[in-house]
C-alpha cells in the first residue's frame, strides 16, 4: 500500500529544496560572475552574467600570449601568471607533504607514547595555533632575515623560507591525526610487535595504511591553506618572478589601473590545482571525514 505524505511534510520538503537551491545559487553566482568578467572585452567589473560578446584576450594574456588588436597594437602579457601558478603549486605541494610527515610522526608520539609534559605540550600547541599568523609577521621577517645570512635557501625572497614558515602551522593537524590514531586499536601494533616488527615497522606498515583517509584530509587542507595564503608569502617574497599566484594577483589591482578581466582569468586559473587535488583525493577525503577508524 502506497504511503501518502501529509501536506505539512510536503511543504517542509518544498521549503528545504528551495532553501538548498538558493544556497547553491548564492555559492555559484560569484564563480559564474568571475568567469563572465574574464570573458568580457575590456577590464570592467560590472556587466551582465552572460557577455554580449565573448573575448579570449584576458585568457591569452594569462596564459602568456600577446594579444594583437584590430588597430595593430600588441599587448604583451603584463605578468608571468603561469610562473606564479607553478610557484604556488610547488610551494603548496612541498608544504603539504612536509606537514603530513611532521604531523603524522608528532601525532603518533602523542597518541601511543608516554612522556612527561605530554598534556601540557598538546594544550600549548593548540593555544599557540589560535593566534593569527599576522601577529607574527614582524618576528618572521626578522627571523628569516637573520636565517638567510647563514642558510641562504631559507632566507628572505626564497621559496624555501616560505615553505619553512608554513611548516610551523601543524598544531591543528597533529590534534586531528592524533584523534584518528586513537580510534585504531593498539592491539594491531602489538600483534605486529609479537611477529617481530619494530615500532617503526608497526607504524609504517600497520598504522599508516589504516590512516590514509585522514592523511588525505590533512594533505588537502594543508595544500589549500598554502596555495591561498597571502600575508606571509607577500612579506617574505620580493621579486615578481618569485611570487605565488595569490600574491601576484594583487599586481592587477593598483590605484592607477584595475585590470579586472585579467584578474578574473588568473583567479579561475588559480582554482584549477585545488580542484584537481580534490578530484584525485575525493575517495580518501570522504572516508577521512566520515570514518572513525578500525575497531577490534
Swiss-Prot record:
It is a multi-pass membrane protein. The chain crosses the membrane at residues 13-35, 89-111, 124-143, 153-175, 205-227, 258-280. It holds the Pfam family BPD_transp_1. Residues 85-281 form the ABC transmembrane type-1 domain. Residues 1-12, 112-123, 176-204, 281-296 are cytoplasmic. One of its GO terms (molecular function) is ABC-type maltose transporter activity. One of its GO terms (biological process) is maltose transport. It is found in: Cell inner membrane. One of its GO terms (cellular component) is plasma membrane. InterPro entries: BP-dep_ABC_trans_perm, MetI-like, MetI-like_sf. PANTHER family: MALTOSE TRANSPORT SYSTEM PERMEASE-RELATED, MALTOSE_MALTODEXTRIN TRANSPORT SYSTEM PERMEASE PROTEIN MALG. The complex is composed of two ATP-binding proteins (MalK), two transmembrane proteins (MalG and MalF) and a solute-binding protein (MalE). NCBIfam families: PRK10998.1. Part of the ABC transporter complex MalEFGK involved in maltose/maltodextrin import. Probably responsible for the translocation of the substrate across the membrane. This is Maltose/maltodextrin transport system permease protein MalG. It comes from Salmonella typhimurium (strain LT2 / SGSC1412 / ATCC 700720). The lineage of its organism: Bacteria, Pseudomonadati, Pseudomonadota, Gammaproteobacteria, Enterobacterales.
